[in-house]
């Protein structure tokens, strides 16, 4: 057997040649994790050491997940969608992306899920790009003060708690008090601006349904279609049957779609119906992921959940296009308790609230706005001149009426001034009633509120207030130019008031009450007022 000799020079030469000719493999590498446990919309995943917070992950069946908890040994993942097919041992892969949704005008008139996928059976949506869900809100220097009105078409709100473009106005109240009805009426009222074709007036609307019944969402869509409002509205639907993950991200999806329009100089109205359901979904996710519970078992960052969402609603500066996104968050209370955790959180974040009282709703006062607790902190600067002039005393008159009404229940005798105040308050309360899906124009609101606050209805039976108002508006529309003048100037001058006073008095003379009696008794003509003397006949005279 030949002796083996090792030559170091030969070995060194062979290694050098190998290193020079070596080419790394082009095969891509990918981190792979495995499902340790799964259930209730949550999965615990091992592996994936490079995973980032809020990164999108994909499961074997294509379902997406959101990396929520980054623990030492595993990742807590919120499953976005159906979680029944996810089982222990399945592979999980990173995407290297954060959650985003498609955006663009193609979303107008469509119903989508929280991932931006159409669910209305009308085909694919033509998009203009994507926008991440966790987008930063505009900073202070890029905001413009709220100074443009956003009319709801509801007399009680536009007169007493006005809303401006870029404002966050909370709608709060017990279940079945008309919260959604106010939001839908506000969307329908934007139709007049949309049909004008003026981009500065047009408002694109987004309705985010969180935790609602599927039949309720379908009913809202049908109402918007019948009113012709669906062409400028997008519905983001996350019904009660959806997973907690979908309910959690749905408001952020709607906000991302709206921000795309806002930063392009357009005006947006977004309704979150409702944030109580989103907070409950976030609570269930946090408890399943073993995050420490706080007050009412909500996690400690539930305030941040809503603040980072609602702070995106703003009117941006002219440098960024001058667009706006107005937010109408809805929160449900229990037994009219506005001091609960979520209501107080959202009240402190928003620019005002409209509180709907269940007692008023049950007494057929609809919209059931509680004047005493409802407020708009910044909307007054955006209110039109005309409406501001006529509604100055309305809120205080109604507040005094409420307090005097409770006192009058125990008082046997009232002075004339108190009786007059009670009478005026009762007529104003009746005047502010408004059926659903019948928004008023700004000029109609001005005339109605003026007539109520100036005693033009004080001598009417309560049941005739609304018929009188309807007849008065028809009379003014067909016989005068007063409504047109108010609409074009957005002001209520002394000359306009004098002409309106004369026209309303003329209508009062023609109005007949439900009892069949004229409101104003006609005075008999003067030529018939002098008595006719009988001719005297004296006997014996010729």
UniProtKB/Swiss-Prot annotation:
Biased composition range(s): Basic and acidic residues: 519-542
Reactions mediated catalytically: ATP + H2O + 4 H(+)(in) = ADP + phosphate + 5 H(+)(out)
Domain of life: Bacteria
Compartment(s) where it occurs, according to its Swiss-Prot or TrEMBL record: Cell membrane
A GO molecular-function annotation: ATP binding
Keyword Cell membrane: yes
Underlying gene: atpA
Predominant localisation class: membrane
GO CC terms of this entry: plasma membrane; proton-transporting ATP synthase complex
Protein name: ATP synthase subunit alpha
Family affiliation: Belongs to the ATPase alpha/beta chains family.
Keyword Cell wall biogenesis/degradation: no
Alphabetically ordered keywords of this record: ATP synthesis, ATP-binding, Cell membrane, CF(1), Hydrogen ion transport, Ion transport, Membrane, Nucleotide-binding, Translocase, Transport
Subunit structure: F-type ATPases have 2 components, CF(1) - the catalytic core - and CF(0) - the membrane proton channel. CF(1) has five subunits: alpha(3), beta(3), gamma(1), delta(1), epsilon(1). CF(0) has three main subunits: a(1), b(2) and c(9-12). The alpha and beta chains form an alternating ring which encloses part of the gamma chain. CF(1) is attached to CF(0) by a central stalk formed by the gamma and epsilon chains, while a peripheral stalk is formed by the delta and b chains.
Coiled-coil ranges from the UniProt annotation: none
Region (Disordered) location: 518-542
Binding-site residues, ATP: 173-180
HAMAP family for the chain: ATP_synth_alpha_bact
